[in-house]
Swiss-Prot record:
The active site is at K117. Its EC number is 6.5.1.2. This is DNA ligase. The gene is ligA. The keyword Manganese applies. It is an enzyme of class 6 (ligase).
Length: 673
């Protein structure tokens, strides 16, 4: 009996290690999470019942150790060196030339192993006879802190290597990090508990690893990607860096999936550019690429200089955060009258572009930052996000710094600015009397997702409003060739193109028309829901507050915005004028889609869809009765993932949300179209 129990314990450990490897390293889960949990629970129960067969490398031993009073110091047998940095193509070319000049026999085209530079915490993990024995931070490169108990809680780090005859000693070096999706979930949970949140995934990863209580670390979504081997005894390692990383992967150690061999400098630069473009879709933070000579013999020949190897370099991405000076603040007026403070900055190069303006959002943000004109500020620009001020160096504040005073009157029309209780935004009360609001409302009306009037752009609208030739959207359809041709940079041909676009735009859809009206908080999706629900403009106009709230995703606030819009005589007059100018659409027909896979489900779209646009897919889902959300959460039922899906897909996988591809989405929806 006891032998059979012992055998079952060993088999359970092997099975769980296998599935941990499949899940965490190969990203290829073989069994449902519930089945893994069942096996794990069975093993834990047996180990409690038969403590004589306890093993420190069992999958059950990742969590539960007592808190430490302090971290012990660990002396690294081989120094954990940092890398020199390159910040331009020229510096990378110089790095390659230095290598070629130093080598006795240098190949014409050197082969490099290239990988993303993860923004995490460097660690060293020692395996003795295949078992995880010690782990340490890099520290100063010579001495680090003992974080063994914490590293044992990281789910994708094996406690035992997956191989028959493991090395006597093997030191794995890598980066511990946190995915963007894991970081979001961690901060959401912290907010729900009223706790302090982390500023970014790197801080979260570093703070989690340096917890004195490993039980806290075990609750954090940490991951490891190995990038090199340190000490190795009792094993003949492969002769290239790339092959060593693939070998690590084969024995259960996770490595990055984007690693690539590149021959020659141009291919290295192509890799750098490709990864920089792919950066926003990876699902984790990186700040550059790491380029290493692939041949280990050449690495040894090149050796080290000071605290960095001669055979490797980090080619950093342009900084996403920089320091600059706030020179002034201007207050802009938006389509709905929102007053937005815009920071005028001393120009600074951030994330590949020169930034001279940044948003300050609203008055509350100005107060929160305690920012003044003349301050040295931290600017952040990431991807396509509008640059913003995220911090102030108050210790550098000059004696002549000026307090930012939020206006009480509109800077464009002089109307009173009010702030409704419960809203962060202050607004101009001038309505369409305000030229700024009029311009933005008209720009919205002609935009691609609204009336889609190609030949009428922002510059043309600004001229027409400034010359008081248009006041409402209906006035656009009353323009003639001579009026347009007399405008700057127009001419007869451009004027005729604009008139043709206006004529073509007269045939639209009810949903587009509703969206084009610019009712506050009525976006594309809500406009489509309103059109599908009421089917006619007249029915929408006459709807009560209660009837409006029966529409999908229309709550009390949005219903009130719509209701008030139709009670304003000026708005009704403009709409009637538009209809009189020939705006029309086909009758809305909503098919009975019955029960289908998407009905009453919360669905998230992510990545690039190749067979239809994102807006079209969103509309289709809503027609099928789905609620389309912009973010993944525990309440999400389904994620439709297109090409280059990023952090939303990662978060869906972490939360166990069902994911389908575009072809499956189309196949499921086709029978109901």
């Amino acid at each position: 009996m006891t032998d059979s129990i012992k055998l079952e314990i060993e088999q359970l450990r092997q099975t769980l290690r296998y599935h941990e490897y499949q899940y965490h390293v190969l990203d290829n889960p073989q069994i449902p999470d519930a089945e893994y949990d069942r096996l794990f629970h069975r093993l834990k129960t047996l180990e409690q019942q038969y403590p004589q067969w306890f093993s420190p490398d069992s999958p059950t031993q990742r969590v539960g150790a007592k808190p430490l009073s302090a971290f012990a110091q660990v002396q690294h047998e081989m120094p954990m060196l940092s890398l020199d940095n390159a910040f331009s193509d020229e510096e990378l070319h110089a790095f390659v030339k230095r290598i070629q000049d130093r080598l006795v026999f240098s190949p014409k085209l050197l082969e490099f192993c290239c990988e993303p530079k993860l923004d995490g915490l460097a660690v060293s993990i020692l395996y003795v006879d295949g078992k995880l024995t010690q782990a340490a931070t890099r520290g100063d490169g010579s001495t680090g802190e003992d974080i063994t108990l914490n590293i044992r809680t990281v789910r994708n780090i094996p406690l035992q290597l997956l191989m028959e005859n493991p090395p006597t000693r093997l030191e794995v070096r890598g980066e511990v990090f946190m995915s963007q999706a894991g970081f979001e979930v961690l901060n959401e949970k912290a907010l729900a508990r009223g706790e302090k949140t982390f500023a970014n995934p790197r801080n979260a990863a570093a703070g989690s690893l340096r917890q004195l209580d490993p039980r806290i670390t075990s609750q954090r979504p940490l991951l490891l990607n190995a990038y090199s081997i340190g000490v190795a005894e009792g094993i003949d390692l492969p002769d290239t860096h790339f092959e060593r990383l693939q070998w690590l992967k084969s024995i259960g150690i996770p490595v990055n999936n984007e690693i690539q061999l590149c021959e020659g400098t141009e291919n290295v630069l192509n890799f750098y550019r490709a990864i920089m473009q792919k950066r926003s879709t990876l699902g984790y933070d990186i700040d550059g690429t790491v380029i290493k000579v692939n041949d280990i013999a050449l690495q040894e020949e090149l050796g080290f200089i000071s605290k960095a190897p001669r055979w490797a370099i980090a080619y950093k991405f342009p900084a996403q955060e920089e320091l600059t000076v706030l020179n002034a603040v201007e207050f802009q007026v938006g389509r709905t009258g929102a007053i937005t403070p815009v920071a005028k900055l001393q120009p600074v190069f951030v994330a590949g572009v020169t930034v001279s303006n940044a948003t300050l959002h609203n008055g509350d943000e100005i107060a929160r930052l305690d920012v003044a004109i003349g301050d040295t500020v931290i600017i952040r620009r990431a991807g396509d996000v509008i640059p913003q001020i995220i911090g102030v160096l108050h210790e550098k504040r000059p004696a002549n710094a000026e307090k930012i005073v939020f206006p009480t009157e509109c800077p464009v029309c002089g109307s009173v600015i009010v702030r409704i209780e419960g809203e962060a935004v202050a607004r101009c009360t001038g309505g369409l009397f305000c030229a700024a609001q009029r311009k933005e409302a008209l720009k919205h009306f002609v935009s691609r997702k609204a009336m889609d009037i190609d030949g009428v752009g922002a510059k043309l609208i600004e001229q027409l409003v400034d010359r008081e030739q248009i006041h409402t959207p209906a006035d656009l359809f009353k323009l003639d060739l001579n009026t347009l041709a007399r405008l700057e940079r127009m001419g007869l041909k451009s004027a005729q193109n604009a008139l043709d676009s206006l004529q073509k735009a007269k045939k639209t859809t009810l949903a587009r028309f509703i969206f084009a009206l610019g009712i506050r908080e009525v976006g594309e999706a809500t406009a489509l829901n309103l059109a599908n629900h009421f089917k006619t403009l007249e029915a929408l106009k006459e709807a009560t507050l209660e009837q409006l709230q029966e529409v999908q995703d229309v709550g009390e606030v949005v219903a009130n915005r719509i209701f008030v819009f139709w009670r304003e005589p000026h708005n009704v007059a403009v709409v009637e004028d538009l209809i009189a100018q020939g705006i029309h659409w086909e009758t809305v027909e909503v098919k009975d889609v019955g029960d289908n896979p998407f009905k009453e489900k919360t669905v998230v779209l992510t990545g690039t869809l190749t067979q239809m646009g994102r807006t079209e897919a969103k509309a289709l889902l809503q027609q099928l009765g789905a609620k389309v959300s912009g973010s993944v959460s525990a309440k999400t039922d389904l994620v439709v993932a297109g090409d280059s899906a990023g952090s939303k897909l990662t978060k869906a996988n972490e939360l166990g949300v069902k994911v389908i591809d575009e072809n499956t989405f189309l196949a499921w929806s086709k029978p109901y179209l």
